[in-house]
Amino acid sequence: MIATFIISAVYASGAVNAPETFEQKIPNSLAKFEMARIPAGEGKQDGKSVPVKSLWIGRTEVTWDVYDIWAFRRDLDQDTVNRGHFDANARPSRPYGAADRGFGHAGYPALGMTARSADLFCKWLSEKTSKKYRLPTVVEWEYAARAGTAAPPAKLGDVAWYWDNADDKTWPVGKKPANAWGLFDTLGNTAEWAKLPDGNAVVCGGSFIDKAPEVGFGARKTPAPAWQQRDPQRPKSRWWLSDGPFVGFRVVCDD
């Protein structure tokens, strides 16, 4: 199914123009999400300027509405699932307990997935849509989150869900104002997977569990064993972070 291109009328206060966007529909489902065009420019890597090409990036974190289709095989008919006629290595096992931790589901950010899960979701999404979806690099993520500004938000609570205002849970995506390039929740809510030059992943931006000094464009966390401390499996799950409810992601689409 070909995505429908639209120009969004919703954008950050102070933005000069509404962002160029397209709506990506998931074939054979009602699920959809919006991507925004990010202009080419320069980002920072190890203190040095590096070029960033123009690309599309999710306006919000990936929500359960979309993630469920892949993670819980809702695009497969029951007979296919029962007979095991699918690549089980490319789909998650069931998590222990509620995947959404009881925070909320429809319209809420998917959370608690490993970087491997996020990568394989992007592969599935690419196959479903005939586009090239992937995780952003750390440079791309920060460049898009900053949206042309070097300064941190004047009032963090106006744009981010974090320790002081989140009530120890995630919130539906898109409830805070977007940045100048039309992106919501780049800071707070869930910290977002992004790739380092060596191919490993970190989470960026801070999350609902973090206090103000840990939420920002340069905030990074490296995966740690504590993120799976209560996982009863040996070895630990390749799919889920039993103690990482603060981890989510958004996707990038290359032209």
Task: Label every model-predicted segment.
Residues A36-R37, L111-G112, R134-P136, P172, ...:
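Structural recognition of the beta-strand scaffold that forms the well-ordered cores
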Residues G14-N17, A115, P177-N179, L196-D255:
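Disulfide-stabilized, aromatic/cysteine-rich ligand-recognition loop
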Residues V16-P27:
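N-terminal low-complexity, Pro/Thr/Ser-rich intrinsically disordered segments
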Residues A160-L187:
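Short, well-ordered junction/capping motifs at the entry into regular secondary structure
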Residues P51-K155, P197, C253-D255:
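Active-site microenvironments of metalloenzymes and redox enzymes
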Residues L55, A106-P109, V173-G174, A178, ...:
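Active-site rim elements
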Residues A31-E42:
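Mature N-terminal segment immediately following signal peptide/propeptide cleavage
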Residues I2-A9:
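Bacterial N-terminal signal peptides
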